[in-house]
Amino acid sequence: MTSSVWQERRHGEDKQRRNDHRSPYQRDRARILHSAAFRRLQAKTQVLGVGMNDFYRTRLTHSLEVSQIGTGIAAQLRRKYPQHKQLLCSMSLLESLCLAHDIGHPPFGHGGEVALNYMMRDHGGFEGNGQTFRILSKLEPYTLDFGMNLCRRTMLGILKYPAPHSKLFVAGEHNEITNHRQLKPSQWPPVKGIFDDDNDIFAWVLEPLSEADRSRFTSPQQGSHPALHHYPHLRTQFKSFDCSIMELADDIAYAVHDLEDAIVMGIVTASQWHQDVAPTLTNSGDTWIRQELADIGNKLFSHEHHLRKDAIGTLVNGFVTAIVISEDDVFEEPLLRFNATLEPEFAIALNVLKQLVYKYVIRKPEIQMLEYKGQQIVMGLFEAFASDPERLLPLNTQERWRESEQQGLNSHRVLADYISGMTDEFAGRLYQQLFSPKAGSNVELSKEM
């Protein structure tokens, strides 16, 4: 059903080793799992700031949970749809996507992303998913120039937003800020797409598609989505089959597991659950949701740890088993023709949980203060490096910056690459070294690259 062209790598397979009988996707999974970029996720913010509590999830633990949920979704779909077993040919492929999906996210979560996007506003912007694509295909030093050199299908699956920045960007009217402290994230949302600097790799990924499929797959939505009325840019509208599974797993992990963190830390209370969640789910058109609601609510806020874990497991199971395969018969390529989707009533329930996390966790002033602080750190670092790259950047990054300048490329992208790869702790420590008179004199720039 799917062509072998999707297993091809840009640089071929030059890592054949003795008695290595792994599949191409098992190799991809190993490359991601053993990468420095993946390890750094242990010290990057998920929702609650690193250091707020010894229970919180980091982007690393989140990615591991997304991987487990993703393979659970695939196993369910295999049983439901035996006719699509060739589409669901590799658990290692889905694990690869789920493990890698957050690799490009910068320090300090959304605050760091908005800060880098602002600093890159005249140089192609910045967005975490676009950076993930760039790390996998170009930056991670598994090969000299081809990043991890992953299979084409893996790279297709990581494309949550398959269109270049220039195709999606809509210029808005902004009041030019005179001080970084004035930056409002709502005024500088990142374009969700691929950086134009990586168009050559993007074209290679889409090479097997027909012209009609390629044109439609990369076409932006016409008109604004009602849920995105504050988002000024165009949005992509399609994703591959593998990506649809990864994205559902990510959404489930975000809504359920981040909610669990918030409940344990006392940020979300039973009264908020009954006010914001219960009314919608009580009137659900799905019998299972209505029947399980009261029991789940009681267990989530129980003082018995095992009861709360049972409720979390029930929620995850409910969403995973409510996923179906939908078909868009306009596409010729099976990887685009089919997508995994949630049954409508469960999609509503998942959105209610996501909104609960957003309202009481993401928008909590203490969380926003951490984001704001991270925003200032990232902008301060970028401004310093941009002022004198050959003085302040580590030597190997200086070399990349010089090569970019000499070749007439986007040298600011090198600065974004360097800063986005930092952990929260390293970025904060480096900021102190640069700007605090009381900071020590030993700066270990090389440890991050």
From Swiss-Prot:
Keywords, in A-Z order: Hydrolase
Domain HD: 59-255
Organism ancestry: Bacteria, Pseudomonadati, Pseudomonadota, Gammaproteobacteria, Alteromonadales
UniProt protein name: Deoxyguanosinetriphosphate triphosphohydrolase-like protein
GO molecular function, one term: dGTPase activity
Domain of life: Bacteria
Coiled-coil segments on the chain, per record: none
Composition-biased stretches (Basic and acidic residues): 7-27
A biological-process GO annotation: dGTP catabolic process
Pfam family of the protein (one): HD_assoc
Family: Belongs to the dGTPase family. Type 2 subfamily.
InterPro entries: dGTPase, dGTPase-like, dNTPase_2, HD/PDEase_dom, HD_domain, PHydrolase_assoc_dom
CDD domains per record: HDc
Entry-linked Gene3D superfamilies: Hypothetical protein af1432
Region (Disordered): 1-27
